[in-house]
């Protein structure tokens, strides 16, 4: 590994760490009471980044099939009663809906980044849809 030049830094003037003799020794020798292990927690954002990578790699549908099918049938009821759907038609609708949502969230994220934020907000979705020409 290449050696890098170290630059001098100003000391912050913090206190030197004190030695803890009695308390640490007592803590180490004492048996663990209860024995309940604290559940492991990742730092905020770690799991979110892992999920982003996982879902960007995958191609499977993210909305469950039956709830989506019920939604399609419920919306179709407003136009005509007793409509029947081929399973491939519902699958095509679901593919299109998920592709639309993914694209909308990508544009929404760009709007949030443009506003120097990392959190998306409803106003970002509204701006993305307005720029796309979907809503005046």
From Swiss-Prot:
Residues annotated with N6-acetyllysine modification: 10, 15, 19, 24
CDD domains, sorted: HFD_H3 (cd22911)
Chain segments carrying region Disordered: 1-43
Keyword annotations: Acetylation, Chromosome, DNA-binding, Methylation, Nucleosome core, Nucleus, Phosphoprotein
Residues that span the membrane, as ranges: none
The keyword Phosphoprotein is annotated on this UniProt entry: yes
InterPro entries from the UniProt entry: Histone-fold, Histone_H2A/H2B/H3, Histone_H3/CENP-A
N6-methylated lysine: modified positions: 5, 10, 19, 24, 28, 37
PTM annotation (Phosphothreonine): residues: 12
Iron-sulfur listed as a keyword: no
PROSITE patterns, alphabetized: HISTONE_H3_1, HISTONE_H3_2
PTM annotation (Phosphoserine): residues: 11, 29
UniProt-recorded name of the protein: Histone H3.2
